[in-house]
């Protein structure tokens, strides 16, 4: 038994010895009558205590008039009362020492201020008792046949029991996933609807499923992550335990994000921040809702994809091309068999009608012969040419769905390579039979490819190396103003944390500008100095390649241009050394409900045009390490520009990594004091010459 009190409570939720049903009904057609009916139907062996002052009995169970009358403290209570009365029952349950209550009522934080106040009242009433919900559909322990839910999706006589644990912030989606899994023969272990998460939330159940021996894969339907640090800790623990997480995050569009907020009353982070969170924690993001179960099904087999070479075995050429194309789009390879494999295949079948020496391997109508199929499978599974196998079921799957299943199932123990199936026709029976036989079957070529991609993600992902960024203890910022900093002030801040910045002088007159240019030497850059104008070039506030002889006149012209564009005559300027050579990058920070992220991408005036950027969330403490900084840079499409693209000189990547680490350390150390910050451009010079911040903005509180 775990010594963690929360783990013990969730263990009781999954497998309670007794259940109280507050507001129970004797009518199994009603929502209030279903929990008791489902518990009986699926053979629950524990005690059931219905509570309803209007009834003496519900079936064989005595019905109690109130919570105080219960014969013992239940492990779990299901509260079926409306939002206006649920908190009273919760308070009474807490008073008798009930470990946990499931509150189904809606009308809480998802409805606005009044509902939020009601939700706070519910939290206060619970005291130390744990709450699942409100606005939840409950949970189901399919492993042990324990139903703590009134969902109509649970009317089925037999649950599809397997190794996928599902946590959803939507109760309705939970029922949808159960029915979809059952229809395709895909087994699940646990189903949990967290919904408003007044107490127990997503991360708590990730931890619980990591500890659950029946669960191999964790599938999440996410509307918002309310506690990012807890989520990160739980997700990394799952990966260390060898239990991959697949997540479908709603809210990728503005409309979807607004709908998610209105559904649970939680602030949603930006979608790209979720990409960063998932990437850093090894969570596989399902791009389509159907991928959530598809990828999970492949991972639940426990088979490992060690390479990207896929054999396609088909009896229909068109479907083989579909699968090959879908795999190619995700960077998988479908090579022809090696000479020995091709010879072994040709020895099994003769005639021009077969295409056994290419990939897809097309057995045509001979695929209907189980003996031949069995022999071909053995050859392909043993072949060094392939890391995995896709079997395509053609029209034979409609009339005789069991035809291929037996042969495939017999061959599976011969190899630990992943084997997936694509069902080309509409053949639900074939899908179910193959999936139950240990071969996840998919109804689209794209889903099959996505499943392989999920398996490859698990194999390739490595936990981030924990590094401590160089500390800059005692960095003084009290001399800098609060609010938006001008460029000179922002670069003072950056340089104090270790980012090299351009040499520059502040001027107000043409004469001062000329003196500054001569002092710096060579052509210079003349800039407007302002804390309110961010995009200086848009208002005529930047001039490059200006000589000392030209700079005075150029300053006067800039005054006129800026005044015309903004309505205000400027009186402060920067004369700055020109940086030549290298490539321009953007290095910034972004604050979000999910946390603070560091952004790296192609910079200069094209930054917003190309939008080639990478994000990394800061860890709980400290900045990013060099390994994470390098991973950021290498993930960009423009990484080759740093790495000697087409004979160009290699850039000073080490200096760039130092700058990323320093900048992130600044964001971590200043915390809430730093509202935003950005360097654009950050010049990354040729190897050995370092980097140089040529412009930047920052805002301090």
Regions found by a protein language model. Name each.
Residues 1-701:
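Catalytic-core regions of core metabolic enzymes
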